[in-house]
Each structure stands twice: as structure tokens, then as C-alpha cells.
From Swiss-Prot:
It is found in: Cell membrane. The gene is cycM. Keywords: Cell membrane, Electron transport, Heme, Iron, Membrane, Metal-binding, Signal-anchor, Transmembrane, Transmembrane helix, Transport. This is Cytochrome c homolog. Heme c binds at residues 84, 87-88, 151. It comes from Bradyrhizobium diazoefficiens (strain JCM 10833 / BCRC 13528 / IAM 13628 / NBRC 14792 / USDA 110). GO terms for cellular component: plasma membrane. May be involved in electron transfer from bc1 complex to aa3. GO terms for molecular function: electron transfer activity; heme binding; metal ion binding. Pfam families: Cytochrom_C (PF00034).
Length: 184
């Protein structure tokens, strides 16, 4: 290869680089981006007033469960609880699935029993029994009521639907608990 051919190749490469450089400067001058003062996006989130003793679940219910249970329907609760059937069973002596069998859960100890179901450490650590109020908070926001629970369900936001499900769960027992009366 002689020097004339080499000069043509180097000239073409340098010319291409020069064209790219001029094009880049021109594009930046015409379309200069407006850089924000602080990089990223601000996401405005309302603070939840219920981040208290119960892990934020207290604010989930707008009405007391005692009042809601007065108008709750076991039949509607059975229909609404079908979505729970993907992970739970409801019949007496039924098998555990991803979640435990829920027959007779109202008034039972939290994180214990349930035919050998392996509860999460968070559920075992919470202790206590499943009261109507605790079930309401848990079904509204499982991870808010018991942070670290293995239950992946997001919760039931509608108060009346939760009350129906709780009334249904209460009916699943040989000795259902009396529904609490609404305090005035």
C-alpha cells in the first residue's frame, strides 16, 4: 500500500470524526436538555396516620368492626372468601395449602396449631388470639398488621366485604363466637 492510499483512508476516518463532532455540537446547541436541580423524580406520598402500635393497619378500617358485623352477611362472605380459596381451605379437618385451613380460626391462637402448618416467624412472634378486630386489621392489610408475614395477599380494602368474610369465618366452627355488639 502506498502513502497515497494511506492518506485517503486516514482522511476519510478524520473527516467522519469531524462530521460526527460537528453534528454532536449542533444537536446539543439546538436541543439542549434542561437538567433538574436534583436528579430523579419526587414521588409525593400521603403519610398514613395509622403507623402506630399495630403496624399501620389501624387506619385501614373506617368503621369499627363491631358495627360492621351487625349488617354482615355470611352468604356474601362465603362468596367473597372464594378468592381466599386459592391458598386456604375452609372445611373441618381440611388440608393446609399455601396458607392454613381456616375452619374455626376465630378465637384460635395466632401462629399455632392448624394441623401442623408452618407459620412464619412474624406470625408466631405476634402471639395472641384471632379476635374479630385483629382479623379485620389483618384481612385489610396483612403485611401492615403483621410485618414479615408470609401471606402475599394485598388485603380487602372494602369494609363491608371484610365484615362479610369475618362473619363467614366465624360461622365455620362447631361453636361460633357471638358477634360483638356495636358500642355507641
Amino acid at each position: 500500500m502506498d502513502s497515497f492510499e494511506l492518506n485517503k483512508i486516514l482522511g476519510a476516518v478524520l473527516g467522519t470524526c469531524l462530521i460526527l463532532l460537528v453534528t454532536s455540537f449542533t444537536a446539543n446547541a439546538l436541543f439542549s436538555p434542561k437538567m433538574p436541580e436534583k436528579p430523579g423524580f419526587e414521588i409525593a406520598v400521603k403519610e398514613d396516620a395509622g403507623h402506630g402500635k399495630e403496624g399501620g393497619a389501624a387506619a385501614a378500617a373506617s368503621e369499627p368492626i363491631e358495627k360492621l358485623l351487625q349488617t354482615a352477611s355470611v352468604e356474601k362472605g362465603a362468596a367473597a372468601a372464594k378468592k381466599c380459596g386459592a391458598c386456604h381451605t375452609f372445611e373441618k379437618g381440611g388440608p393446609n395449602r399455601v396458607g392454613p385451613n381456616l375452619y374455626g380460626v376465630v378465637g384460635e391462637a395466632r401462629g399455632e396449631g392448624r394441623n401442623g402448618f408452618n407459620f412464619s416467624a412474624a406470625m408466631k412472634g405476634k402471639g395472641g388470639t384471632w379476635t374479630f378486630d385483629d382479623l379485620n386489621k389483618f384481612i385489610a392489610n396483612p403485611k401492615g398488621f403483621i410485618p414479615g408475614t408470609a401471606m402475599g395477599f394485598a388485603g380487602i380494602p372494602k369494609d363491608s366485604e371484610r365484615a362479610d368474610v369475618i362473619a363467614y369465618l366465624n360461622s365455620l366452627s362447631e361453636h361460633p363466637k357471638p358477634l360483638p355488639t356495636a358500642s355507641k
